[in-house]
C-alpha cells in the first residue's frame, strides 16, 4: 500500500465551496488519504457541512478553532497529521483527480523532499469543470537544490504552500508564523529550505485556484495589509542566511510590495485615506530606507521607478493621482 497522505484544509465561512473542494480531494486517483478539516470559527453553515462530510467519508477528521487565523489552523492540521506526507488545500480551491498521484510520483522518481505543481485559476464552477476536460501530458519534473529553488521559483512568484506535497519528516517542527495575514506561505517555505535536499517542480496544472472576489487581496485596505511588507522583510533575512547575493533582488521585491500597499491605501475614499496617515508615513520611511540597498532601485521596471520617485517626494500627490487614475 502507498503511504498515507494527510490533506490539511483550513476553512472559514466556506459554506458555498467547501463540499466541492472535499469532493475533489476524495476523487483523487491516489487513494490512501486522510483529510483534516480545520473549521476556524466559521459563523455560517460550515460547521454543519463539516459534520455532514465526516459522516459521509470515513477518512475525514474535523477540528474546530475559535477564529485564530489560517496559520494557526494549518499548524493544527500539521500537529494532527498521521501521514508520511502532507499537503495543503484552501477550502475554496480544487484538485485535479491526478494531482496527488503526480506529486507523489514526482517525489518517488526524483528522491526529493518536496514536489510542487502548477495551478489554474477559475471564477465559476462551470469554468473549472471545463478545465477538467483538458488533458495534460505529464512530463519529467525539474529538480532544484534549495538555493536554486529560492532564486528560480520563490523569488519569481512560486511562494505558495498549497499545490505542493511535503515529506512529513522534513516538515518536522516547522510551523506557519502566527500573526501574519499575508505572506505566511512564503515564510513557511523559507523556513523549510535549509532542511530539504532537493525540490521537484512539475508543470502539470494539478491545482485549481479560485479567484474569490471576497478574498483577502480583494478587500479594502486595513493596517493588516502592512503584513505584506513585514513578510518580505523577514523573508530577506531568511534568504540571506541561505545566500547573501539575494539581498538586492529581494529588496527590489520589497520596494514593489511597499508600492502595492500604497496603492491599496490610494483606493480608499479621501476621508478614509486621511485616517491612514500613519500607514502612509511608515510606507514612505521604509521606502527611503530600502532605496539605500545597492542594486534594489535598479532592479525595478521603469514604471515602478517613476512610482517610487513620486511617492518618495510627494506621497499625497501620488495617492491622489493613483486614486484619480483608477476611478476616473
Task: Please provide the spans of the model-predicted regions.
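Donor-binding/catalytic cores of nucleotide-activated saccharide
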Residues: 70, 91-200, 207-223
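A conserved acidic beta->alpha catalytic loop
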Residues: 24, 31, 39-48, 66
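N-proximal low-complexity "stem/linker" segments adjacent to membrane-targeting elements
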Residues: 1-27
Amino acid at each position: 500500500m502507498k503511504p498515507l497522505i494527510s490533506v490539511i484544509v483550513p476553512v472559514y465561512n466556506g459554506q458555498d465551496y467547501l463540499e466541492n473542494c472535499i469532493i475533489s480531494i476524495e476523487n483523487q486517483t491516489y487513494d490512501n488519504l486522510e483529510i483534516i478539516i480545520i473549521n476556524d470559527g466559521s459563523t455560517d453553515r460550515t460547521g454543519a457541512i463539516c459534520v455532514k462530510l465526516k459522516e459521509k467519508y470515513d477518512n475525514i477528521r474535523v477540528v474546530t478553532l475559535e477564529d485564530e487565523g489560517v496559520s494557526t489552523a494549518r499548524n493544527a492540521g500539521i500537529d494532527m497529521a498521521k501521514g508520511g506526507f502532507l499537503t495543503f488545500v484552501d477550502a475554496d480551491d480544487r484538485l485535479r483527480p491526478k494531482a496527488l498521484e503526480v506529486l507523489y510520483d514526482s517525489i518517488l522518481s526524483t528522491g526529493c523532499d518536496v514536489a510542487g505543481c502548477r495551478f489554474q485559476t477559475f471564477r465559476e464552477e462551470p469554468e473549472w469543470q471545463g478545465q477538467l476536460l483538458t488533458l495534460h501530458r505529464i512530463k519529467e519534473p525539474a529538480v532544484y537544490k534549495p538555493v536554486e529553488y529560492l532564486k528560480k521559483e520563490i523569488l519569481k512568484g512560486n511562494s505558495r504552500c498549497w499545490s505542493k506535497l511535503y515529506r512529513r519528516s522534513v516538515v518536522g517542527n516547522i510551523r506557519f508564523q502566527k500573526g501574519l495575514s499575508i505572506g505566511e506561505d512564503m515564510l513557511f517555505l523559507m523556513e523549510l529550505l535549509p532542511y530539504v535536499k532537493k525540490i521537484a517542480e512539475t508543470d502539470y496544472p494539478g491545482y485549481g485556484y479560485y479567484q474569490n472576489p471576497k478574498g483577502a487581496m480583494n478587500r479594502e485596505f486595513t493596517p493588516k495589509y502592512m503584513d505584506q511588507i513585514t513578510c518580505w522583510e523577514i523573508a530577506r533575512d531568511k534568504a540571506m542566511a541561505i545566500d547573501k547575493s539575494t539581498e538586492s533582488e529581494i529588496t527590489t521585491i520589497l520596494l514593489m510590495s511597499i508600492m502595492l500597499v500604497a496603492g491599496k491605501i490610494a483606493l480608499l475614499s479621501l476621508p478614509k485615506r486621511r485616517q491612514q496617515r500613519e500607514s502612509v508615513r511608515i510606507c514612505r520611511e521604509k521606502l527611503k530606507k530600502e532605496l539605500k540597498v545597492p542594486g534594489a532601485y535598479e532592479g525595478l521596471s521603469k514604471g515602478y521607478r517613476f512610482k517610487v520617485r513620486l511617492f518618495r517626494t510627494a506621497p499625497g500627490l501620488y495617492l491622489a493621482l493613483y486614486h484619480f487614475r483608477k476611478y476616473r
